[in-house]
Amino acid sequence: MELTLKLLVLLLFILNHHVGSGSIVKFLPGFEGPLPFELETGYIGIGEEEEVQLFYYFIKSERNPKEDPLLLWLSGGPGCSSITGLLFQNGPLALKSEVYNGSVPSLVSTTYSWTKTANIIFLDQPVGAGFSYSRAPLIDTPTDTGEVKRIHEFLQKWLSKHPQFSSNHFYAGGDSYSGMIVPALVQEISKGNYICCNPPINLKGYVLGNPITHEDDPNYRIPFSHGMALISDELYESIREACKGNYFNVDPRNTKCLKLVEEFHKCTDKLNEFHILSPDCDTASPDCYLYPFYLISFWANDESVRDALHVNKRSIGKWERCNYLSKPYNKDIKSSVPYHMNNSVSGYRSLIYSGDHDLVVPFLATQAWIKSLNYSIIDEWRPWMIRDQITGYTRTYSNKMTFATVKGSGHTAENKPQESFIMFRRWINGQPL
């Protein structure tokens, strides 16, 4: 009996160590043959009782894992799985856009994965996103600031289990709503590095694409739409005069402004706001360029895929790519601008980039809050090039901040994978764009 108990305890220890340390994935359903890169998946327990289990995908750099930087990538939402980044933006795999026939959707290799120059952790956060879950009902509604602390704890524990990466330069990154989380996380890590008993994280900076930053961001949709010839000069001048720059939190008594804003929506509501040049199409249609967003649900909910990824049994029900409409969440960070200021003062590098055809977070909104920081301009506005072709425009500021546009791209980087990869590679290597 005593021997049986000892064996049981040993087995539980091995299993827990196996889960906590992550599992190597060599094959994935839908991909032909062994994976051409090193993938690890796993959970890190958060909290005193480790009741929150955050799921991650870790992919080693294809260049030099020992020397290349470590990047934590967070998807937006809030509540979108980080598989959005892995399969649709900057990872080494993509879903093949072919008509769903009931079998596991196919995966193909990508050419311009950011893992060619960095080790990347794709983290499902907040709790409840992707394959992350809580063992017990949450007492409090997840919040921006609460998730920042959880992600910080995740990083500390992940690095303690992967000490070989503790000396690598560390960067945080993400897009869209991660524009609220990442700057706060960088500040949290920076402060945490001064606490005596925690091993310091070798923090160097952060990268953000089309980041939501301030509640005023939507006000820039109207001047952006005018500049893109989506609304007439007459409507723009009238709405600017009537609304005084406040277009999306209008005083109900300002009926003239409200009526003009309604006219604006009539001109733009049928556009694809994530990329104004792309069709506004149904993702369930095989003809839609976003059809892979429809296929991902079949892939991630297939039992063979979950087994291959080592997803804990019965941890979640149906997997959703984004669950921000079905899960409660408190957005308690109203502006991330103060965090940008603090991080710059602390000496951290930052790359802020914008797809110039995004109506959700127009590049004008990003330029406006960067301008509000009052940083000196080190390198004036200029085109950045790939093989003698203009691929965007860039400006470098004091306090190590770089702003860049990606010409022809939308809300996320997948629209221009080559350009976004080369931009990231140059910046992460300390080269001018």
UniProtKB/Swiss-Prot annotation:
Gene from which this protein is expressed: SCPL11
Entry-linked PANTHER family: SERINE CARBOXYPEPTIDASE-LIKE 11-RELATED (PTHR11802:SF361), SERINE PROTEASE FAMILY S10 SERINE CARBOXYPEPTIDASE (PTHR11802)
Gene Ontology terms, MF aspect: serine-type carboxypeptidase activity
Catalytic residue positions: S176, D358, H411
Disulphide bond pairs: C80-C322, C243-C257, C281-C288
Annotated tissue distribution: Ubiquitous.
Keywords for this protein: Carboxypeptidase, Disulfide bond, Glycoprotein, Hydrolase, Protease, Secreted, Signal
EC number(s) stated in the UniProt entry for this protein: 3.4.16.-
InterPro entries: AB_hydrolase_fold, Peptidase_S10
Any single GO BP term: proteolysis
Name by which UniProt lists this protein: Serine carboxypeptidase-like 11
Main subcellular location: secreted
A GO CC term assigned to this protein in UniProt: extracellular region
Organism per entry: Arabidopsis thaliana (Mouse-ear cress)
Pfam (any one): Peptidase_S10
List of glycosylated residues: N101, N342, N374
Role played: Probable carboxypeptidase.
Family: Belongs to the peptidase S10 family.
